[in-house]
Amino acid sequence: MIFGKKKKSTDNKSSAGTEIEVPNLEIKVSGVNKDEAVGLLIACRQLPGYPPAILLVTNAINTRADRILIDFSAQGAVARYRVDGIWESLPAMDRATADALLVVWKKILGLNPAERKARQDGKFATNFRDIDWVISFMSTGVPSGERVLFTIERKKPVLKTLTDLGMRDAVQETLKGMLNGDKGMVVISAPATHGLPTTWRIALENADKFVRDWVLIENKKNQEPDIINVTEYFYEDGGDSAEQVFDKVRLKQPDVYVLPSLIGPQIVEAVLGQIHKEHKHMVTRIVASDAVDALIQILKGNPKHAKALLGVAQGVLNQRLIRRLCESCKQAYQPTPQLLQKLGLPAGRVPKLYKPTIPPPPEQRVDAKGNPIEIEICKKCNGRGYFGRMALFELLVIDDNMRKAFAQLIEKPDELRKFIKQAGHSGFFEEGVLACALGQTSLEELQRILQGK
């Protein structure tokens, strides 16, 4: 089903009366009868909100945005794109234009355009510029009016290896050793919106699964994309319980239990039994601000089995996404000896650091006499100074000294972090400084990430 023609139409005009060229956009709607979908598409092409509706999405893809957020109010609507984790506001829309484009998307997805309060969800697949995309739509009422969120994802993952994520070889070697071990628990974690699902998938796909049997137990309603060579088993309401599924899986004698969540005390106790008696292994994940927070959450969330879980913990991976400097326009500068000392870098070891090229705002693009001057904008990053993201990783190895520290300082996480740093653990600051020294990112961006922004 092709949505939009490149030929100009007198119906496709902007508010200023100029003709709008609407890009081709193939749309395949999920959960809508094919004949019904065709009828909806034909009808929507005649609506005034069709051009801005299509351009909203195609411009987002061209901009590399992975989210589109629209907030409606009585006066109008404000749309924002999220590019490399940073929200960028678009010019404000009048209410009529915003309502018109929203009607189009709700009609396309088989939703109710008149419903502005209850949550509505839809999904469609599209091919744009020879790339397959899956785009989710959600609208819901909020006190100020209505909020709409588009989530844009590639159908086929681009990131496939730990190197693609930005993980150093030494960290990869340690992590793979943990994942390929036995008689223990490995935790993969990250703050919300910092790429945990992607790292979870890639870490598991890069573990050795050819000589060992890996199984994943998950709630069916939370089902995620398949992970290569990991056999999935699901529990669900109205079907087999988690305990019933685990009992069936245990009979198959897998080597590694993959648990996106620890589910409950019965499952935790059962897996711990397999680890101690059968030398099995477990990998789990959790949303957490850092490695210390991740393990503390797991221990406090399972008080009955906290001691046993701490006893089998082998390592905790945590990550934060950070923007990469644009290779086409980044600027080198010579750091002062004082700055190098502050960063913990030996004098003379790093001759150059890099910073982004950010053009001045339009009102400052004038000469000494106030005449406007032309400022060249980087065509690759469009003046953002950054292009794409990588991850900074901290991998906390849990040995007997660490277990003792967690047991004693679990209620004093800041003191625990201080102990871990004194023990030589390389955290986000150290990893970030190394990334800056390699010219991958800037000190300004590192500071933003360390402040949790």
What name fits each language-model region?
Residues 2-3, 20-29, 37-453:
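Short, flexible helix-loop junctions that flank or precede catalytic/ligand sites
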Residues 13, 17-19:
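Long, low-complexity intrinsically disordered linkers/tails
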Residues 1-12:
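N-terminal acidic, proline/glycine-rich, low-complexity intrinsically disordered segments
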